[in-house]
């Protein structure tokens, strides 16, 4: 759909594309591997698009929210969310607006910024930390048998 609008966006003085991915683009969460993979793909696509459109009036932003109070979280069990802080929707929107106004092309509020940092400098450690709740669930299930 975005490609249908590109000719129109290129004609104006200022335009923006905003893709919404996730902090989970940086580190997979075992209980939602496909979700994380799609967000990682969107992150890569957004970076490529930003370079492709760098000589146009179009800015390409990426909002990478952390776990946010939305209906999506209702799909997870409480035990799945242990150790994960959840951002209020209003605060996430405020962070987006602030980043957008400052021309921050990659907006990573809350834990998303921490995930990016940890994935770059301590990739094995953060993957083990993110995997721990799932491993604990498997151990508990094994003991129950």
Give the predicted meaning of each segment.
Residues 4-13:
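A short helix-coil junction within the Rossmann-fold of NAD(P)-dependent oxidoreductases
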Residues 22:
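Residue(s) in the substrate-gating loop at a strand-loop-helix junction
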Residues 51-112:
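SDR active-site lid
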Residues 85, 90-145:
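C-terminal tail/cap regions
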Residues 25-27:
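Conserved catalytic-site region of short-chain dehydrogenase/reductase
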Residues 2, 38:
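Active-site helix of classical SDR
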Residues 29-33:
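Active-site loop immediately N-terminal to the catalytic Tyr-X3-Lys motif
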Residues 6, 41, 46-54, 59:
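Catalytic Tyr-X3-Lys helix of short-chain dehydrogenase/reductase
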């Amino acid at each position: 759909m975005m490609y249908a609008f590109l000719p129109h966006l290129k004609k104006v003085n200022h335009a923006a594309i905003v893709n919404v991915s996730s902090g989970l683009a940086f580190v997979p969460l075992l209980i939602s591997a496909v979700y994380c993979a799609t967000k990682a793909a969107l992150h890569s696509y957004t970076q490529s698009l930003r370079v492709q459109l760098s000589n146009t009036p179009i800015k390409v932003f990426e909002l990478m929210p952390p776990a946010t109070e939305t209906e999506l979280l209702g799909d997870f069990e409480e035990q799945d969310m242990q150790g994960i802080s959840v951002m209020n929707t209003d605060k996430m929107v405020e962070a987006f607006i602030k980043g957008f106004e400052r021309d921050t092309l990659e907006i990573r509020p809350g834990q998303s910024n921490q995930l990016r940092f940890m994935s770059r400098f301590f990739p094995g450690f953060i993957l083990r930390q993110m995997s721990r709740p799932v491993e604990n669930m498997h151990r508990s299930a094994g003991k129950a048998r």
